[in-house]
Protein backbone atom coordinates (compact mmCIF):
# COMPACT_ATOMS: atom_id res chain seq x y z
CA UNK A 1 0.00 0.00 0.00
CA UNK A 2 1.23 3.46 -0.93
CA UNK A 3 1.02 6.47 1.37
CA UNK A 4 0.84 9.87 -0.30
CA UNK A 5 0.86 13.21 1.48
CA UNK A 6 -1.56 16.01 0.66
CA UNK A 7 -0.07 19.31 1.79
CA UNK A 8 -0.49 23.00 1.09
CA UNK A 9 -1.37 26.29 2.74
CA UNK A 10 -4.41 26.85 4.89
CA UNK A 11 -7.58 27.40 2.85
CA UNK A 12 -6.18 25.77 -0.28
CA UNK A 13 -8.86 23.07 -0.39
CA UNK A 14 -6.92 20.00 0.77
CA UNK A 15 -9.83 18.40 2.64
CA UNK A 16 -12.21 18.85 -0.28
CA UNK A 17 -9.81 17.15 -2.66
CA UNK A 18 -9.03 14.32 -0.23
CA UNK A 19 -12.76 13.65 0.21
CA UNK A 20 -13.28 13.53 -3.55
CA UNK A 21 -10.36 11.14 -4.00
CA UNK A 22 -11.58 8.70 -1.35
CA UNK A 23 -14.97 8.62 -3.09
CA UNK A 24 -13.53 8.17 -6.61
CA UNK A 25 -14.48 4.61 -7.55
CA UNK A 26 -12.69 4.76 -10.89
CA UNK A 27 -9.47 5.76 -9.16
CA UNK A 28 -9.84 2.98 -6.59
CA UNK A 29 -10.38 0.49 -9.41
CA UNK A 30 -7.29 1.72 -11.25
CA UNK A 31 -5.16 1.54 -8.10
CA UNK A 32 -6.48 -1.89 -7.16
CA UNK A 33 -8.09 -1.19 -3.81
CA UNK A 34 -9.75 1.19 -1.40
CA UNK A 35 -8.41 4.71 -0.87
CA UNK A 36 -8.18 5.69 2.79
CA UNK A 37 -7.34 9.04 4.37
CA UNK A 38 -6.11 10.47 7.64
CA UNK A 39 -6.06 14.15 8.58
CA UNK A 40 -2.96 14.69 10.73
CA UNK A 41 -4.08 18.14 11.82
CA UNK A 42 -7.45 16.73 12.94
CA UNK A 43 -5.64 14.00 14.88
CA UNK A 44 -3.74 16.67 16.78
CA UNK A 45 -6.88 18.73 17.43
CA UNK A 46 -8.54 15.66 18.93
CA UNK A 47 -5.46 14.90 21.03
CA UNK A 48 -5.44 18.43 22.41
CA UNK A 49 -9.06 17.99 23.47
CA UNK A 50 -8.83 14.48 24.92
CA UNK A 51 -5.31 13.93 26.28
CA UNK A 52 -4.75 15.40 29.77
CA UNK A 53 -1.01 14.75 29.55
CA UNK A 54 -0.73 16.65 26.25
CA UNK A 55 -2.89 19.43 27.66
CA UNK A 56 -0.52 19.80 30.61
CA UNK A 57 2.55 19.88 28.36
CA UNK A 58 0.99 22.51 26.11
CA UNK A 59 -0.19 24.57 29.07
CA UNK A 60 3.36 24.61 30.38
CA UNK A 61 4.36 26.36 27.15
CA UNK A 62 1.24 28.52 26.81
CA UNK A 63 -0.23 29.12 30.30
CA UNK A 64 -2.74 31.65 29.00
CA UNK A 65 -4.42 28.94 26.90
CA UNK A 66 -5.28 26.78 29.92
CA UNK A 67 -8.86 26.87 31.20
CA UNK A 68 -9.76 26.28 34.85
CA UNK A 69 -10.81 22.69 34.13
CA UNK A 70 -7.44 21.92 32.52
CA UNK A 71 -8.70 21.96 28.94
CA UNK A 72 -7.21 24.24 26.30
CA UNK A 73 -8.71 27.34 24.75
CA UNK A 74 -7.99 26.71 21.07
CA UNK A 75 -8.44 30.37 20.11
CA UNK A 76 -5.90 31.59 22.66
CA UNK A 77 -3.55 28.76 21.78
CA UNK A 78 -3.65 29.57 18.07
CA UNK A 79 -3.25 33.28 18.72
CA UNK A 80 -0.13 32.72 20.82
CA UNK A 81 1.37 30.15 18.46
CA UNK A 82 1.00 32.17 15.29
CA UNK A 83 2.40 35.31 16.91
CA UNK A 84 5.59 33.55 18.08
CA UNK A 85 7.44 31.35 15.57
CA UNK A 86 9.62 29.86 18.31
CA UNK A 87 6.54 28.81 20.27
CA UNK A 88 4.91 27.36 17.16
CA UNK A 89 7.98 25.21 16.50
CA UNK A 90 8.03 24.03 20.11
CA UNK A 91 4.35 23.09 19.99
CA UNK A 92 4.80 21.24 16.70
CA UNK A 93 7.78 19.30 18.07
CA UNK A 94 5.62 18.30 21.02
CA UNK A 95 2.69 17.11 18.94
CA UNK A 96 3.98 15.68 15.66
CA UNK A 97 5.14 12.38 17.19
CA UNK A 98 1.46 11.73 18.00
CA UNK A 99 0.51 12.33 14.38
CA UNK A 100 3.31 10.05 13.19
CA UNK A 101 2.04 7.26 15.46
CA UNK A 102 -1.54 7.70 14.21
CA UNK A 103 -0.37 7.60 10.60
CA UNK A 104 1.62 4.42 11.21
CA UNK A 105 -1.43 2.77 12.79
CA UNK A 106 -3.63 3.84 9.87
CA UNK A 107 -1.08 2.51 7.42
CA UNK A 108 -0.85 -0.87 9.14
CA UNK A 109 -4.66 -1.12 9.30
CA UNK A 110 -4.92 -0.23 5.62
CA UNK A 111 -2.36 -2.83 4.64
CA UNK A 112 -4.20 -5.47 6.67
CA UNK A 113 -7.48 -4.63 4.94
CA UNK A 114 -6.00 -4.69 1.45
CA UNK A 115 -6.36 -0.97 0.77
CA UNK A 116 -4.34 0.45 -2.11
CA UNK A 117 -3.59 3.93 -0.85
CA UNK A 118 -3.51 6.05 2.29
CA UNK A 119 -3.76 9.82 1.83
CA UNK A 120 -2.11 11.79 4.63
CA UNK A 121 -3.47 15.32 4.86
CA UNK A 122 -1.27 17.81 6.73
CA UNK A 123 -0.01 21.34 6.27
CA UNK A 124 3.49 20.82 7.66
CA UNK A 125 4.53 17.54 6.05
CA UNK A 126 8.05 18.75 5.35
CA UNK A 127 8.75 20.64 8.58
CA UNK A 128 7.31 17.83 10.70
CA UNK A 129 9.43 15.15 9.06
CA UNK A 130 6.31 13.17 8.18
CA UNK A 131 7.13 13.35 4.47
CA UNK A 132 10.14 11.11 5.06
CA UNK A 133 7.79 8.17 5.61
CA UNK A 134 5.65 8.78 2.51
CA UNK A 135 5.84 7.70 -1.12
CA UNK A 136 5.13 11.14 -2.54
CA UNK A 137 3.36 14.42 -1.87
CA UNK A 138 0.69 16.45 -3.63
CA UNK A 139 0.89 20.22 -3.15
CA UNK A 140 -2.65 21.61 -3.16
CA UNK A 141 -2.69 25.37 -3.65
CA UNK A 142 -4.98 28.15 -4.83
CA UNK A 143 -4.63 31.90 -5.42
CA UNK A 144 -4.46 33.92 -2.22
CA UNK A 145 -7.77 35.69 -2.80
CA UNK A 146 -9.56 32.35 -3.05
CA UNK A 147 -7.87 30.98 0.07
CA UNK A 148 -8.58 34.17 2.02
CA UNK A 149 -12.25 34.09 1.00
CA UNK A 150 -12.60 30.50 2.20
CA UNK A 151 -10.96 31.35 5.52
CA UNK A 152 -13.19 34.38 6.05
CA UNK A 153 -16.17 32.09 5.46
CA UNK A 154 -14.80 29.84 8.24
CA UNK A 155 -14.90 32.76 10.64
CA UNK A 156 -11.26 33.82 10.69
CA UNK A 157 -10.48 37.53 10.71
CA UNK A 158 -8.18 39.19 8.20
CA UNK A 159 -5.62 39.63 10.98
CA UNK A 160 -5.75 35.93 11.89
CA UNK A 161 -5.37 34.96 8.25
CA UNK A 162 -2.33 37.21 7.93
CA UNK A 163 -0.65 35.65 10.97
CA UNK A 164 -1.24 32.12 9.71
CA UNK A 165 0.03 32.96 6.25
CA UNK A 166 3.16 34.49 7.77
CA UNK A 167 3.74 31.32 9.79
CA UNK A 168 3.48 29.28 6.56
CA UNK A 169 5.77 31.55 4.56
CA UNK A 170 7.88 29.60 2.08
CA UNK A 171 5.76 26.45 2.39
CA UNK A 172 5.09 26.14 -1.33
CA UNK A 173 8.76 26.63 -2.18
CA UNK A 174 9.88 23.96 0.29
CA UNK A 175 7.30 21.47 -0.93
CA UNK A 176 8.19 21.97 -4.59
CA UNK A 177 11.90 21.70 -3.79
CA UNK A 178 11.13 18.40 -2.08
CA UNK A 179 9.47 17.00 -5.20
CA UNK A 180 5.78 17.62 -4.46
CA UNK A 181 3.41 17.53 -7.44
CA UNK A 182 1.43 20.81 -7.64
CA UNK A 183 -2.36 20.68 -7.89
CA UNK A 184 -4.21 23.87 -8.81
CA UNK A 185 -7.22 24.01 -6.48
CA UNK A 186 -8.24 27.41 -7.78
CA UNK A 187 -10.16 25.64 -10.56
CA UNK A 188 -13.52 23.98 -10.12
CA UNK A 189 -13.74 21.23 -7.51
CA UNK A 190 -14.14 18.57 -10.20
CA UNK A 191 -11.16 19.82 -12.21
CA UNK A 192 -8.90 19.96 -9.14
CA UNK A 193 -9.95 16.47 -8.02
CA UNK A 194 -9.37 15.08 -11.52
CA UNK A 195 -5.87 16.57 -11.63
CA UNK A 196 -5.09 15.09 -8.21
CA UNK A 197 -6.41 11.68 -9.31
CA UNK A 198 -4.19 11.73 -12.39
CA UNK A 199 -1.18 12.60 -10.22
CA UNK A 200 -1.95 9.69 -7.91
CA UNK A 201 -2.23 7.29 -10.84
CA UNK A 202 1.21 8.41 -11.95
CA UNK A 203 2.76 8.07 -8.49
CA UNK A 204 1.18 4.72 -7.76
CA UNK A 205 1.68 3.07 -11.14
CA UNK A 206 5.14 4.24 -12.14
CA UNK A 207 6.73 5.38 -8.89
CA UNK A 208 7.58 8.75 -10.46
CA UNK A 209 8.14 11.63 -8.15
CA UNK A 210 10.40 11.59 -5.14
CA UNK A 211 9.81 8.45 -3.06
CA UNK A 212 11.40 10.36 -0.18
CA UNK A 213 9.98 13.87 -0.68
CA UNK A 214 11.96 15.32 2.19
CA UNK A 215 15.27 14.02 0.88
List the model feature ranges, each with a label:
Residues 6:
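Hydrophobic anchor at the beta1->P-loop junction of P-loop NTPases
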Residues 9:
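P-loop (Walker A) phosphate-binding loop of NTP-binding proteins
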Residues 12:
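ATP-binding Walker
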Residues 15:
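Walker A/P-loop
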Residues 42-115:
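ATP-dependent small-molecule kinase phosphotransfer cores
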Residues 102-103, 130-133, 152-215:
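Small-molecule kinase domains that catalyze NTP-dependent phosphoryl transfer to phosphate-bearing small molecules
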Residues 104-112, 117-153:
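ATP-dependent NMP and nucleoside kinases share a basic, alpha-helical "lid"
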